[in-house]
Swiss-Prot record:
GO terms for cellular component: chloroplast thylakoid membrane; photosystem I. One of its GO terms (biological process) is photosynthesis. The lineage of its organism: Eukaryota, Viridiplantae, Streptophyta, Embryophyta, Tracheophyta. May help in the organization of the PsaE and PsaF subunits. This is Photosystem I reaction center subunit IX. It is found in: Plastid, Chloroplast thylakoid membrane. Belongs to the PsaJ family. The keyword Repeat does not apply. It comes from Atropa belladonna (Belladonna). Keywords: Chloroplast, Membrane, Photosynthesis, Photosystem I, Plastid, Thylakoid, Transmembrane, Transmembrane helix. It comes from the Eukaryota.
Length: 42
């Protein structure tokens, strides 16, 4: 039971960190390539 409580307390933290990192990455991509619906450098 203690392992279940540890998992339930760790998963929201890890998912929050993942979404913050993903949002930061998308913000930085949009800062360097604004309004890039298509990426012409491919």
């Amino acid at each position: 039971m203690r392992d279940l409580k540890t998992y339930l307390s760790v998963a929201p933290v890890l998912s929050t960190l993942w979404f913050v990192a993903l949002a930061g990455l998308l913000i930085e991509i949009n800062r360097f390539f604004p309004d890039a619906l298509t990426f012409p450098f491919f």
